[in-house]
């Protein structure tokens, strides 16, 4: 029986050089991925929330909004850094389309993020003041109209949305729910108030047709109807409140903004010397909504020494790895968050099933 040695191929220099170039090109080529990692939390109980010409109370403790650092939508990500980040776990690596709408231009994404933050300041103030029993007037206006929307032919940026299909709009979520059960191609009657040349408001009512949402699809991949309008919020509040924050976008600071306002406007000591962090969107009525990057935000909170983390209950399926020493309190409303903060340290809140 003979031993047969395997054949050994010797690649010529041109072939080797070609594969070297191919490998190098792959590592240096931009690819459609993004990184995100925990951001540094911002302290709300310092000068971030400023109450003007109204009595405030000393704050005993620290309250933080949390954030994530995400690759900008127009920033290139290269193959080599993607492989390294994935291998060592320095950052979470995700396909770009998992975070940013694939058809939305980078400048629109960034503008929308800033608009969401501005709206969050209004809705959090509304939620906090409503919780404290103050009355005020809320207004919702068109802040942008998408090119794919036929509303562009009938309405203008700055129009105040007053009615949809004959129903008076009292809260921003009523705008979204007004067409949630409708289909693409269905009509929608919208009434707005528009300021004329004399500075007077005129009521304008017109019909639009629901179009396919070109930025978001349903979880099952089916197409979602849209009016193609971005809505901003403003209000005439009895208390003047400013937010001194830059470089943070999106709506996820709303819940903690609202808690911070309540902490400053009331004598009650909710923080009791603790470091409390959290996240969550909020509606003017105090409903708390889910956000992205919850685990990265918990890590950021843990790094600055927070012992309590307030999170949206809707995010419970995403809360799996809780940092040591961090008590996570899931809530559905602002009122639940306040009740949880009032409770003694020995109190064990109803936790997420999988945490």
Regions found by a protein language model. Give the residues of each.
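Terminal peptide-recognition signature
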Residues: 129, 151, 158-161, 165, ...
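Hydrophobic membrane-insertion alpha-helices, especially the h-region
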Residues: 15-33
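PDZ/PDZ-like peptide-tail recognition elements
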Residues: 40-73, 93-146, 214-238, 242-247, ...
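Conserved PDZ fold ligand-binding element
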Residues: 151-175, 298, 305-307
């Amino acid at each position: 029986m003979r031993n047969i040695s395997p054949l050994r191929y010797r690649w010529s220099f041109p072939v080797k050089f070609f594969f070297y170039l191919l490998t190098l090109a792959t590592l240096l080529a931009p690819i459609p991925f993004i990184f995100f990692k925990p951001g540094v939390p911002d302290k709300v109980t310092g000068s971030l929330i400023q109450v003007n010409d109204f009595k405030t109370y000393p704050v005993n403790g620290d309250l933080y909004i949390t954030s994530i650092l995400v690759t900008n939508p127009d920033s290139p990500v290269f193959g080599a850094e993607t492989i390294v980040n994935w291998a060592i776990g320095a950052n979470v690596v995700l396909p770009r389309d998992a975070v940013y709408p694939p058809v939305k231009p980078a400048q629109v994404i960034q503008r929308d993020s800033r608009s969401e933050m501005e709206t969050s300041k209004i809705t959090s103030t509304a939620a906090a003041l409503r919780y404290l029993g103050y009355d005020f007037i809320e207004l919702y206006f068109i802040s942008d109209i998408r090119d794919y929307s036929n509303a562009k032919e009938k309405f203008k940026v700055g129009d105040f949305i007053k009615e949809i299909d004959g129903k008076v709009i009292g809260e921003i979520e009523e705008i979204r729910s007004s067409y949630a059960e409708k289909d693409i191609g269905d009509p929608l009657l919208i009434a707005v108030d528009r300021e004329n040349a004399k500075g007077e408001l005129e009521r304008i009512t017109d019909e639009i047709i629901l179009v396919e949402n070109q930025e978001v699809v349903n979880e099952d991949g089916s197409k979602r109807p849209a009016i193609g309008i971005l809505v901003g919020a403003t209000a005439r509040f009895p208390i003047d409140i400013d937010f001194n924050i830059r470089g943070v976008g999106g709506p996820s600071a709303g819940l903690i903004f609202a808690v911070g306002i309540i902490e400053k406007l009331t004598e009650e000591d909710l923080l009791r010397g603790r470091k409390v962090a959290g996240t969550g969107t909020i509606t003017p009525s105090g409903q708390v909504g889910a956000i992205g990057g919850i685990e990265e935000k918990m890590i950021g909170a843990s790094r600055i020494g927070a012992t309590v983390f307030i999170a949206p209950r809707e995010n419970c399926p995403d809360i799996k790895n809780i940092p040591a020493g961090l008590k996570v309190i899931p809530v559905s409303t602002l009122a639940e968050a306040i009740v949880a903060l009032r409770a003694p340290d020995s109190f064990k809140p109803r936790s997420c099933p999988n945490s």
